[in-house]
């Protein structure tokens, strides 16, 4: 077959009937997308057999059994640990999570005393606008931030005492005749170190015994250093 002298191939029936390739339905993009999703999600049985033929099922080996046992044991231990932690917190720290954190990280051996201490702190924070003789002048309260926002741990700082100055007079009440500070005045340096260490550590009722001993030793060493390095009254000046 030739058209105007140009040889044309013999047209088949499919191409001859209205050019079938021009009459195919052109789907929109969203239509093609959803058609693809439906074909993936809801394949017919024939489609499943064609795309994914049945494979022989793998038999579980002893490694698989060991892995399953280990996973089951770990899961059981984790659940038991969480249950034990919840039971511990509910039994010992049912009132306050803050007290629980304080007891865990500050070494508190008397939770009731600590709880009352925190309750007093909270009540003082609520009543910051009310004058309190224990807190001092309300206008100067922001300067006492450690009293309100401290951690509550009873670790007192080391008290620096200048042994070169004369000791304050003893505070003795005429009714009881309590002259507990007279030995510190008459004893001089060593007596002052012992009495001040005892006085400081007596307020540390929440610390264990070994911490009290460490505290006393540190205070004695610091005060001995201050006493040695401080100016002496009878020392001769090198200028003279």
From Swiss-Prot:
Disulfide bonds: none annotated. It is found in: Host membrane. The chain crosses the membrane at residues 69-89. One of its GO terms (cellular component) is host cell membrane. The keyword Transmembrane applies. It is a single-pass membrane protein. The keyword Iron does not apply. Signal peptide: none annotated. Residues 119-143, 164-200 are annotated as: Disordered. It comes from the Viruses. Keywords: Host membrane, Host-virus interaction, Membrane, Transmembrane, Transmembrane helix. Interacts with host ATP1B1. This is Protein UL136. It comes from Human cytomegalovirus (strain Merlin).
């Amino acid at each position: 077959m030739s058209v105007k002298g140009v040889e044309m191939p013999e047209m088949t029936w499919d191409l001859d009937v209205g050019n079938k390739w021009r009459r195919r339905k052109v789907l929109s993009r969203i239509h093609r997308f959803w058609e693809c999703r439906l074909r993936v999600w809801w394949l017919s049985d024939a489609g499943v057999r064609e795309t994914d033929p049945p494979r022989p099922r793998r038999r579980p080996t002893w490694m698989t059994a060991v892995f399953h046992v280990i996973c089951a044991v770990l899961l059981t231990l984790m659940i038991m640990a969480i249950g034990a932690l919840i039971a511990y917190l509910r039994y010992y720290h049912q009132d306050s999570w803050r007290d629980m954190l304080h007891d865990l990280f500050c070494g508190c051996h008397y939770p009731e005393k600590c709880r009352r201490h925190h309750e007093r702190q909270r009540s003082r924070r609520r009543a910051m606008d009310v004058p309190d003789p224990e807190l001092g002048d309300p206008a100067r309260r922001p300067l006492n931030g450690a009293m309100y926002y401290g951690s509550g741990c009873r670790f007192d700082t080391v008290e620096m005492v200048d042994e070169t100055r004369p000791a304050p007079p003893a505070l003795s009440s005429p009714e009881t005749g309590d002259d507990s500070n007279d030995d510190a005045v008459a004893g001089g340096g060593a007596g002052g170190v012992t009495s001040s260490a005892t006085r400081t550590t007596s307020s540390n009722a929440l610390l264990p015994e070994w911490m009290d001993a460490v505290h006393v030793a540190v205070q004695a060493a610091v005060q001995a250093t201050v006493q040695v390095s401080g100016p002496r009254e009878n020392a001769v000046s090198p200028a003279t």
